[in-house]
């Protein structure tokens, strides 16, 4: 256990990425030089006693090979990109077991970057807004991004590309835990025959006139001209004319019907448990509902081990998460044993003072403790970054 603990401590304190500030460019009129003194120490964990409870659970997991431990990593673009979190997830699951991918969200449907092992595709019209820009009328919850639609004609397909994250358990997180979605793991295709107007054409030959062509096909000259956008009777050799016709021809259309499965409603989510491992699933509208919003999905398997969930929003600050109580209300759905907060990059380019930043951070921690009192909390310092892709942040 000692070696495993040392490895985890090293990863937690040393893995940082010299990324640029968030990928969605936000113009800031100026920066403020904070008067707070910065001391550059070696990587270390301050107040390590605060995570003793987590390490005790980690020790039990290592010894008994039973149960699951949930790590939830909250942050900005470094976390949404699943770079830091993917490395941590792989290392911890290699050491303590893989219990599933954890939290995911259809970021690509919200027109932003997605986590590599998970792919989403969708049909339908969706609106999305990040917690940076959303007001409190928007259903911003666990993902930090509002994704909604008022159409009941849509589908969202989840496809897990990496076999090690195939799943047997799915949890659906929605505002107020409303039953908004049906879930399908199978579908059937029905071929439907319909009648469509038959397309008749005529290629003009040398010497033919428009009136003669109309007589040949028993249509009026006016109808023939209208069908081809002609304003005069002049036509040229070789032109292909569309001939108005009342004839029809069959057209075969394949209609896909998704077969919904029963979900189990709990206090925090709607769940599905499968006897076999799944790599894809489809979400369709509950036909008894008109407004749809999705806050997140949780994927697990039947194995003991670590579930490492990343929740990141490009450009986010502590204050952006603090604006939305729903984020904290839904946090217990992840059953967190350890919560890692990696924010501060975007604050460092803002006009916040150190006192303002720590006030927001304290508020965030207090809200987390209120909803997840048994979770240990680790706050990491921001990684190196650059402003506007060229100015090094030295503050």
Residue ranges of each PLM-predicted region?
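Short glycine- and acidic-rich boundary segments immediately preceding or forming the N-terminal edge
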Residues: 19-58
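Bacterial Sec-dependent N-terminal signal peptides
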Residues: 1-30, 35, 242
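Solvent-exposed, polar/charged alpha-helical surfaces in well-ordered, non-transmembrane soluble domains
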Residues: 52, 56, 82, 86, ...
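Second-shell loop/turn segments in exported
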Residues: 69-79, 209-213, 315-317, 347-354
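Primarily a LysM-type cell-wall glycan-binding module
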Residues: 191-221, 231-232, 239-240
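Serine-esterase "nucleophile elbow" of acetyl-processing enzymes
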Residues: 45-125, 129-131, 162, 170-195, ...
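Solvent-exposed, acidic/flexible segments
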Residues: 77-85, 203, 207, 217, ...
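Alpha-helical cap/lid subdomain in secreted, periplasmic
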Residues: 20, 25, 135-195, 300-307, ...
